[in-house]
Amino acid sequence: MMSTLFPKLSIKKEDTLPALAISELNDWALITMIGNDKKSYLQGQVTADVVTLPQDDITFGGHCDAKGKLWSIFQLFNHNDGYALFQRRSAIETELTEIKKYSVFSKVDIAVGDDVLLGISGKKATDWVNKHTTTDANVRACELGTFAKISETQWLLVTTPEHKKNIINQESNTVLCDESLWSLHTIQHGLPQLDNALSNAHIPQAMNLQAVGGISFAKGCYTGQETVARAKYRGINKRAMYLLSGQSNSIPVAGDAIERSVGENWRKGGTIVSAYRFEDGYTLALAILPNDLEEGTQFKLQDSIWNKGNQPYSLDEE
């Protein structure tokens, strides 16, 4: 059922995006982690370097199985007296089970948070956050809750139902819309995310986690590290996440298969990670594809031809 407070925003390809918009992020959730052993426990589980993460900063990270396949992709930051791992809700149940698997041996409490998650997006998002905070850090605790910078045009606010109500009442001149606009910003910035349809299927480098600072190759051991390291030093990874564009009749969803041209034929070429469809049918998507594609390779989805674009970052590892 569509929210009347946060309605879908009708946008065409040529339209200018709202300079400031607020969305409730119902398709996202937090896993929270508190307790004396939270830092050491998480350090041994994920690709990011938790030990060196500053109190007021945020980092991408991934949680893998022993073979290096991802259970989750998250953005990690300090929240209240512990950690928050911001990730897709569809994969949260599986991830909670996996991340808690060895917690019985540590003083750590892991749960799915019940906070309200608001997404502040647009070129004026940082200006809006600045009005409510007193620092210029990437993570800011304030009266409203915790702000975390997701990208140059996206801020997450972890807050309460009461603060959400007050914000809606006070922001009469701000665009309130559903979270599809948030998804568009995420895709434009090339940010990886992992829904349940992609769970336990890909290694971190196949989803560009190294390109967004989500893998530390200097930290100690963690689950799946051997595979992740071999992908870097021995070149065993054969996939990466790319931006695609084309026409669609309906919005593609995570896990949808894409075909690619091979000579005069078509064969399975990749998998959708996330997508946004404009009102005129023009669609942007992030997709996992082979990383050795020939120049000019075309793609097909929903019987339409799609083309590969450029990501806003380099995929080359140092």
Swiss-Prot record:
It is found in: Cytoplasm. GO terms for biological process: iron-sulfur cluster assembly; RNA modification; tRNA processing. Folate binds at W28, W182. GO terms for molecular function: folic acid binding. The keyword Cytoplasm applies. It holds the Pfam family YgfZ_barrel. It comes from the Bacteria. Keywords: Cytoplasm, Folate-binding, tRNA processing. GO terms for cellular component: cytoplasm. Folate-binding protein involved in regulating the level of ATP-DnaA and in the modification of some tRNAs. It is probably a key factor in regulatory networks that act via tRNA modification, such as initiation of chromosomal replication. Belongs to the tRNA-modifying YgfZ family. This is tRNA-modifying protein YgfZ. It comes from Aliivibrio salmonicida (strain LFI1238).
